[in-house]
């Protein structure tokens, strides 16, 4: 029996125990592994002989996709965002691109509030001082009564809204595809534009997809419209914000803090301006990374791949062929 040769680049899929590994038995699959996220040059070096690829946030450009042919039958994205994949090129080249919606929204929402509480209650700096032998108290801020502004009220944004209401926060949001029933049930005020959300909120949380149209959307001009000292949370994509403008606003006090799970590019570069900015809490793109969500996501990514290889429809596909 000829084995199906696949490439797996996502590290959490590889490193986390779970049932997803059982879907790829050694007698059926010949598995190559790489440690992503990989830049274009590195992917070009290793692709071309695989029937299927389970990828993370690797740079699947047109050149990479062309190199994958003629053998590649499916590109299975482990995760939701497909902004690192050239979807028009994949469609033109007849490569199905699958993805994994609905598997990590609770996990990301919990992480969002972890970053927020770290900022408002100054947890990381106080922890660092105590470990240095200093017992120095700081004064933080309450969340109750403040306004949480959510940009992107999809699955993750909705979970953030529910948690904000549990903290007795007011919630406003903007989304092109408004869920009126959810908003009424959970007391979410609809704002006509994203800029209106910025002006109204003490806390702003980004949960938008990254597109060519909204790259660097949160820039100096829009930051200037925010309430002075507002907190910004980004568990979506680093490219949604102009990182230099964020750093400048933090230094000037226009932003009170930045909870940052994502940067552009990743891994973070040594000259990223955010590294020298005050009041930033970083995590290395791990908002969706819990044992529970990894298994859900990995199962769907593996099942999507197996379904397409077997001639069946996947759970979710990002392009129409």
Residue ranges and their predicted role:
Residues 32, 39, 49-127, 141:
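Phosphate/diphosphate ligand-binding glycine-rich loop within oxidoreductases
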Residues 9, 150-151:
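Conserved N-terminal Rossmann-fold NAD(P)-binding element of oxidoreductases
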Residues 93-95, 101-147, 155, 159-162, ...:
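Phosphate-binding beta-alpha-beta segment of Rossmann-like dinucleotide-binding domains, i.e.
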Residues 1-52:
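N-terminal glycine-/charge-rich "phosphate-binding" loop or analogous flexible N-terminal tail
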Residues 61-65, 176-273:
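Rossmann-like adenosine-cofactor binding region
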Residues 3, 72, 144-147, 220, ...:
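Phosphate-coordination loops involved in phosphoryl transfer and adenosine-cofactor binding
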Residues 68-73, 93-95, 169, 228-230, ...:
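A short helix->loop->beta-strand "cap" motif at the edges of active sites that frequently abuts
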Residues 2-3, 15, 91, 98-110, ...:
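C-terminal helix-to-coil terminal segments
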């Amino acid at each position: 029996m000829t084995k199906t040769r696949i490439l797996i680049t996502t590290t959490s899929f590889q490193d986390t125990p779970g049932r997803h590994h059982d879907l790829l038995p050694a007698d059926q699959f010949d598995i190559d592994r790489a440690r992503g996220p990989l830049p274009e040059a590195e992917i070009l070096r290793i692709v071309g002989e695989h029937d299927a690829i389970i990828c993370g946030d690797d740079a699947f450009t047109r050149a990479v996709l062309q190199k994958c042919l003629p053998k590649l039958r499916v590109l299975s994205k482990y995760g939701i965002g497909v902004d690192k994949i050239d979807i028009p090129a994949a469609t033109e080249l007849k490569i199905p691109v699958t993805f994994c919606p609905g598997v990590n929204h609770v996990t990301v929402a919990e992480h969002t509030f972890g970053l927020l509480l770290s900022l408002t209650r100054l947890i990381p700096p106080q922890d660092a001082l105590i470990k240095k032998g200093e017992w120095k108290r700081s004064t933080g801020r309450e969340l109750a009564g403040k306004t949480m502004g959510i940009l992107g009220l999809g699955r993750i944004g909705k979970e953030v809204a529910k948690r904000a209401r549990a903290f007795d926060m007011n919630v406003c949001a903007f989304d092109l595809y408004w869920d009126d029933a959810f908003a009424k049930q959970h007391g979410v005020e609809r704002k006509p534009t994203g800029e209106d959300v910025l002006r109204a909120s003490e806390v702003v949380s980004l949960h938008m997809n990254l597109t060519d149209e909204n790259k660097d959307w949160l820039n100096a001009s829009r930051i200037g419209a925010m309430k002075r000292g507002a907190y910004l949370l980004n568990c979506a994509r680093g490219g949604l914000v102009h990182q230099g403008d964020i750093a400048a606003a933090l230094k000037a006090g226009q932003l009170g803090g930045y909870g940052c799970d994502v940067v552009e590019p990743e891994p973070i570069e040594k000259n990223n301006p955010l590294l020298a900015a005050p009041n930033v809490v970083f995590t290395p793109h791990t908002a969706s990374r819990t044992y529970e969500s990894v298994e859900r996501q990995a199962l769907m990514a593996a099942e999507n791949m197996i379904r397409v290889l077997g001639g069946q429809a996947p759970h979710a596909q990002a392009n129409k062929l």
